[in-house]
A protein has these predicted regions:
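Intrinsically disordered, low-complexity coil segments
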Residues: 16-18, 72-78, 86-88
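Redox-cofactor binding/interface segments in oxidoreductases and associated redox assembly factors
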Residues: 45-46, 96
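Residues that form generic nucleotide/phosphate-binding pockets
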Residues: 7, 11, 69, 85
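Mobile active-site "lid"/loop adjacent to the S-adenosyl-L-methionine
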Residues: 48-82
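Conserved Class I SAM-dependent methyltransferase catalytic core
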Residues: 78-124
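Glycine-rich nucleotide phosphate-binding loop and flanking beta-alpha elements
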Residues: 35, 52, 102
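S-adenosyl-L-methionine
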Residues: 1-43
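A short acidic (Asp/Glu
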Residues: 8, 56, 105-108
Length: 124
């Protein structure tokens, strides 16, 4: 998203005096396309937006703004398709954050880490 990139870049530029941001490189690209071109990844951490539900809609006010920005730029949230693309990247491990009751993207999970409302599916 060009808008999100601009907002993040502006925030980073305003925080230049903080050491952690000095080594941060922000790239404006589709994450899946970029991951397929890049060759230096060992691990991918995939944290797709959770599907909307009545229960979590009230708690995700700030994320709703991000969803609106993506809709304005006609960027679709398709985590299943993104997972398929990211699965083709030659990496050692992929960690996928999912709602605890959500179906996994693939049945080839090597192991899982469970929390109260979230789980992490790990593919090796």
């Amino acid at each position: 998203s060009k808008i999100l990139f601009f907002l993040l870049n502006d925030g980073i530029n305003r925080s230049n005096n903080q050491e952690i941001f000095k080594s941060l490189t922000l790239i404006n690209a589709n994450a899946c396309s970029y991951a397929l071109r890049a060759t230096k990844f060992d691990i991918i951490y995939f944290d797709p937006m959770y599907p909307s539900s009545k229960k979590n809609a009230l708690n995700s006010g700030k994320l709703e703004y991000i969803a609106r920005i993506l809709a304005t730029e006609s960027i679709n949230n398709n985590p299943t398709q993104d997972f398929k693309v990211l699965s083709k990247v030659p990496i050692k491990k992929m960690i996928v954050k999912r709602p605890i009751k959500a179906e996994p993207f693939s049945q080839t999970i090597n192991y899982q880490v469970h929390g109260k409302t979230t789980r992490f599916d790990i593919y090796i």
